[in-house]
Structures are given as structure tokens and as C-alpha cells.
UniProtKB/Swiss-Prot annotation:
GO biological process: cell differentiation
Native organism: Mesocricetus auratus
InterPro entries documented for this protein: HD (IPR001356), HD_metazoa (IPR020479), Homeobox_CS (IPR017970), Homeobox_NK-like (IPR050394), Homeodomain-like_sf (IPR009057)
Function, as annotated: Transcriptional activator involved in the development of insulin-producting beta cells in the endocrine pancreas. May also be involved in specifying diencephalic neuromeric boundaries, and in controlling the expression of genes that play a role in axonal guidance. Binds to elements within the NEUROD1 promoter.
Keyword line: Activator, Developmental protein, DNA-binding, Homeobox, Nucleus, Transcription, Transcription regulation
Protein name: Homeobox protein Nkx-2.2
Cellular component GO terms, alphabetical: nucleus
Length: 273
């Protein structure tokens, strides 16, 4: 090696331990054929600078940039990115598969439910509409007027009233029930109970005969006491009415003859049958 190597030891050949010149020429000649199969180590021709550039270009490089395969972080990042893309791919591909595979099943299972729900929903909506019927002012007035007269209606009366105000008997019945409930709740909230019927009014009658003896004159104190016990205010009687009552009492006592218990004519007369 020392015999053939006549050049200085600072050449690129000595640094890179490249083969001899004959081998280099052979490699240069065979280079185009072998380039297709794989890169060869070095080819040197011409001056030193050109040979160094050729040697650098002829190095087996995987890519002109830094290879990230040696970095563990990049390897982990690449693995996670691949996993993420795979998940996205599955998510993107899953809906059409699920929709294509499962679409007939829910339609078969849910179609009866939908058919059942649609009439049910329509029935509920119809019931709600029936409950929320808006009565006109004339209908409300007639219903309230009849309610004040009679709180409970029989079936014929209900039908007659419904025909008059252009409603159904069921609507009239429900309105009466709701109105009775509202009235009852209003009384309960106000703390008002059903007031009892007022007792019959007591009228003070002047006493003209007491213990079989006529009363010639009525005293004002006795009349006031009688009216107070009867619950009638004393002011209801005026002075003229009092005088009239006294005059009637005197006239009645004067007009009635008082016969003695033992009259001579009555004792002498004898009836024969």
C-alpha cells in the first residue's frame, strides 16, 4: 500500500480509504451500469476539489434531508400520526357502512313505532286542542248566565244549551266542571265558606191583649225591649206609628163591651127546648 500510494496523505482518497486508481477507472467505466443496481462508493477524476465533490455526491444517502428514523420522538410521532389517520379513516368509513347495514333494521323496527306514535301524537294534539277550545264572548256569557241559575245540568238540558250556543254537550259538561272547580278553589283561597241562608226575619207585633186583659197603652220602654229582642232597630218605628198603635189599642178596648159575670138578664132568662 505504501509503494503504490505516492500522493500525500491529506487527499480525500487517503481520508476515505478509497481503492486505487485502476479500480476507480473500472468503477467509472462500470458506473452507469451499476448505478441502476446500487450506488458505488467513490469515483475520483480530475483535480482534488472535483474528486471530493464527486465522492460526496456518490455517498449512499437515503434522502437529501435529515433522516428522522433515528430519532425516537419522530418515530413515536409518526406512529401516532398513523394511528390518528387510521382512526379518522375508520370514522369516515364507519358511517356509510353503519348506515348501509343498519338503515333497514331501524326502519323495520321503528316504522311500526312511528306509525303508532303518529296517531298517538295526533290524538294527543287533538285532545289538547279540544281542551283548549276558545269560547266566544257570547258563548261564555251564556254559559256563565246559565251557571248562575243552575250549577248542575241534566243531559237534556246540557244538550239543549249546547245546541243554542253551538257547542257539544261534552264541552258544556267540561266547562261546568271546570267552572265549579274554579269557584270552589277561589272560595278556599279567600277563606270564604258557603254562607248559610239567612234566618227568617222576626217581626215585632204589638201585644194588644195580655193575660186576658187588653193593653190600653203601650209604653215606649216595653216596645223598645220587644224590638231589641226581635232584632229590629227601634228607629224603625216613628212617632206616628207609635201613636197609631196606641190609638188602635184604646179603640179595641173601648169597642169590646165588658159584660159582668152575673148579669141579671142572663140569670133570669131560661131557655126551654
Amino acid at each position: 500500500m505504501s509503494l503504490t500510494n505516492t500522493k500525500t496523505g491529506f487527499s480525500v482518497k487517503d481520508i476515505l480509504d478509497l481503492p486505487d486508481t485502476n479500480d476507480e477507472e473500472g468503477s467509472v467505466a462500470e458506473g452507469p451500469e451499476e448505478e441502476s443496481e446500487g450506488p458505488e462508493p467513490a469515483k475520483r477524476a480530475g483535480p482534488l476539489g472535483q474528486g471530493a465533490l464527486d465522492a460526496v455526491h456518490s455517498l449512499p444517502l437515503k434522502s437529501p434531508f435529515y433522516d428522522s428514523s433515528d430519532n425516537p420522538y419522530t418515530r413515536w410521532l409518526a406512529s401516532t400520526e398513523g394511528l390518528q389517520y387510521s382512526l379518522h379513516g375508520l370514522a369516515a368509513s364507519a358511517p356509510p357502512q353503519d348506515s348501509s347495514s343498519k338503515s333497514p333494521e331501524p326502519s323495520a323496527d321503528e316504522s311500526p313505532d312511528n306509525d303508532k306514535e303518529t296517531p298517538g301524537g295526533g290524538g294527543d294534539a287533538g285532545k289538547k286542542r279540544k281542551r283548549r277550545v276558545l269560547f266566544s264572548k257570547a258563548q261564555t256569557y251564556e254559559l256563565e248566565r246559565r251557571f248562575r241559575q243552575q250549577r248542575y245540568l241534566s243531559a237534556p238540558e246540557r244538550e239543549h244549551l249546547a245546541s243554542l250556543i253551538r257547542l257539544t254537550p261534552t264541552q258544556v259538561k267540561i266547562w261546568f266542571q271546570n267552572h265549579r272547580y274554579k269557584m270552589k278553589r277561589a272560595r278556599a283561597e279567600k277563606g270564604m265558606e258557603v254562607t248559610p241562608l239567612p234566618s227568617p226575619r222576626c217581626v215585632a207585633v204589638p201585644v194588644l191583649v195580655r193575660d186576658g186583659k187588653p193593653c190600653h197603652a203601650l209604653k215606649a220602654q216595653d216596645l223598645a225591649a220587644a224590638t231589641f229582642q226581635a232584632g229590629i232597630p227601634f228607629s224603625a218605628y216613628s212617632a206616628q206609628s207609635l201613636q197609631h198603635m196606641q190609638y188602635n189599642a184604646q179603640y179595641s178596648s173601648a169597642s169590646t163591651p165588658q159584660y159582668p159575670t152575673a148579669h141579671p138578664l142572663v140569670q133570669a132568662q131560661q131557655w126551654t127546648w
